């Protein structure tokens, strides 16, 4: 068994793929394998994946029909043989050649379920780093209620970004912690579930991952129809998230924090809806709210008076008037 499997979903990323995989191949730590998951690319990325696999024995390729990043990550996770797994985006890269060596010398031996580290970012067109993730307050092994710690510290990036983490493979597979397919913001749905199941993690202050901020990415060029789809996904994340946390029977101290976190997603979706000009887009989001009205009962967990009031308004006034009020209150 290798120590680490690196999973790289690839979709029309020919321009960036060699730099991405090169940052892994340059690592001084050698006990890893790489799985490239070609998600139905049409720009020549599939051929490049095969070429890279022919040149490097540690590289293998999965070719599949296009299903999105979640589907590609799930395919890679199911095929992963390493003790740990690291998901890397095909347009990003590792920060230097000693990332895995440094983590191996301290974090891998602690056998954590999750290893948290920091990331930095540059905007395409300039190689200058323009943002660095703040340090974690904790350094080393952390055992106990990891989700509560994350929510209390408001580590938002930690709850929504998988690339600045390494996961124990068996931990994910045994808990069936796969990505939800067919939604936007799938990382936001996945990570809180993963963290809620973890009891032994490692925080590292090292900056080990570099994000490329692309102006042509789908998330950087939204339109109202796409925004409506994303708003519906936020509602689904809120609903499935609270359901999962209820099934996990979180502690009385943690459940209010988790509920407040997911109510934030629902509130954002309502604000988005209130701004739409298209009646069809408004209707689409409101229909998603009505379909999941059982979520409103979760307001009983909330400690914030403002959020509890929203739950009451949804139940008493209904969806449309409450969405309008939320837009007025929070949409400035």
Per-region residue spans from a language model:
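Short, well-formed alpha-helical segments that are part of the catalytic scaffolds
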Residues: 12-26
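Short alpha-helix within the catalytic core of nucleotide-sugar-dependent glycosyltransferases
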Residues: 18-22, 46-47, 82, 95-108
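Cell-envelope/extracellular polymer assembly enzymes that use nucleotide-activated donors
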Residues: 2-5, 23, 33, 189
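Catalytic core of nucleotide-sugar-dependent glycosyltransferases
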Residues: 207-215, 221-252, 268-296
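A conserved acidic beta->alpha catalytic loop
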Residues: 38-48, 65
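Membrane-interface aromatic/basic loop that binds lipid-linked glycans or pyrophosphate carriers
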Residues: 273-332
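Donor-binding/catalytic cores of nucleotide-activated saccharide
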Residues: 69, 90-205, 209-228
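Glycine-rich, basic loop-to-helix element that forms the pyrophosphate-binding segment
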Residues: 64-80, 87-90
């Amino acid at each position: 068994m290798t120590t680490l499997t690196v999973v790289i979903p690839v979709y029309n990323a020919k321009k960036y793929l060699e730099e991405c995989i090169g940052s892994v191949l340059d690592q001084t730590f050698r006990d890893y394998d790489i799985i490239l998951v070609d998600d139905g690319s049409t720009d020549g990325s599939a051929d490049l994946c095969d070429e890279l696999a022919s040149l490097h024995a540690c590289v293998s390729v999965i070719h599949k029909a296009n299903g999105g990043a979640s589907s590609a990550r799930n395919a890679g996770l199911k095929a992963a043989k390493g003790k740990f797994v690291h998901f890397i985006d095909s347009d990003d890269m590792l920060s230097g050649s000693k990332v895995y060596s440094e983590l191996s010398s301290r974090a891998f031996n602690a056998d954590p379920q999750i290893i948290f580290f920091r990331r930095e970012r540059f905007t395409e067109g300039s190689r200058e780093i323009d943002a660095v993730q703040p340090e974690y307050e904790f350094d080393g092994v952390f055992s106990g209620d990891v989700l509560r710690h994350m929510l209390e510290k408001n580590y938002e990036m930690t709850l929504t970004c998988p690339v600045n983490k390494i996961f124990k493979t068996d931990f994910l597979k045994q808990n069936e912690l796969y990505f939800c397919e067919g939604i936007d913001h799938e990382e936001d749905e996945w990570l809180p579930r993963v963290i809620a199941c973890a009891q032994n993690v490692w925080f590292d202050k090292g900056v080990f991952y570099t994000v490329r901020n692309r102006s042509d990415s789908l998330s950087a060029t939204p339109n109202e129809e796409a925004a409506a789809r994303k708003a519906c996904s936020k509602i689904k994340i809120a609903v499935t998230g609270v359901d999962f946390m209820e099934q996990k029977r979180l502690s009385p101290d943690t459940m209010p924090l988790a509920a407040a976190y997911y109510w934030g997603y629902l509130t954002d979706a309502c604000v988005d809806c209130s701004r739409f000009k298209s009646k069809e887009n408004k209707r689409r989001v409101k229909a998603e709210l009505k379909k999941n009205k059982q979520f409103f009962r979760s307001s009983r967990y909330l400690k914030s008076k403002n959020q509890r009031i929203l739950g009451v308004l949804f139940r008493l006034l209904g969806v449309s008037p409450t969405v309008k009020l939320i837009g007025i209150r929070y949409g400035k």
